[in-house]
Swiss-Prot record:
Keywords: Phosphoprotein, Ribonucleoprotein, Ribosomal protein. Residues 220-233 have a biased composition (Basic and acidic residues). The lineage of its organism: Eukaryota, Viridiplantae, Streptophyta, Embryophyta, Tracheophyta. Ribosomal protein S6 is the major substrate of protein kinases in eukaryote ribosomes. The modification Phosphoserine is found at S237, S247. Signal peptide: none annotated. Residues 220-250 are annotated as: Disordered. GO terms for biological process: translation. Component of the 40S small ribosomal subunit. Plays an important role in controlling cell growth and proliferation through the selective translation of particular classes of mRNA. The gene is RPS6A. It comes from Arabidopsis thaliana (Mouse-ear cress). The keyword Ribosomal protein applies. This is Small ribosomal subunit protein eS6z.
Amino acid sequence: MKFNVANPTTGCQKKLEIDDDQKLRAFYDKRISQEVSGDALGEEFKGYVFKIKGGCDKQGFPMKQGVLTPGRVRLLLHRGTPCFRGHGRRTGERRRKSVRGCIVSPDLSVLNLVIVKKGENDLPGLTDTEKPRMRGPKRASKIRKLFNLKKEDDVRTYVNTYRRKFTNKKGKEVSKAPKIQRLVTPLTLQRKRARIADKKKKIAKANSDAADYQKLLASRLKEQRDRRSESLAKKRSRLSSAAAKPSVTA
């Protein structure tokens, strides 16, 4: 069985291959998120504590948290759930997919582990070297949270602490820092005020246009009523004059 061991404190990751079943027995029948002592793997892992994060079987089916079985099951999954990508599906469509339970069994080919507690000896490639994080946070609120800043502090000066320096394709030394998103500046506030003013202007124009339309509609209806009353009055006068004429007898 292969072990993908990750060390979050150093940012390193390493793949180990262990074929001895006696060493692997400590991991059997354990579930995802359980912690396992690394003493059974050998002297070099003495004192280490690993946390199981997942794995895959020999056919490539991933383990799913919450499925309490060591074997494989077919579940009805929708888009957004683990073990189902769901690209190109219709909205709300569900598919029945094969997944493996969250209990570790000998059928697994890869098991993902995370070092929770460091042991006595250093593991080459995991604990002896440190890989710095290449990219820091980009959003202004997360930068404030990282450096414990207040609302009135300027975030832009703190981004330079994790500015990357590297050589581009032309062989020139350049530096790069993330573009801060959701940064509140006087220009953004001015744009916001302009948007609100434009919106208010549009609402006022719509209200005035609606009022003018109602006035025009009322005047047109009044003209229509006046014309109708005039035509009715003419009709009545014609009928009354025709009734008042004496009938001509032969």
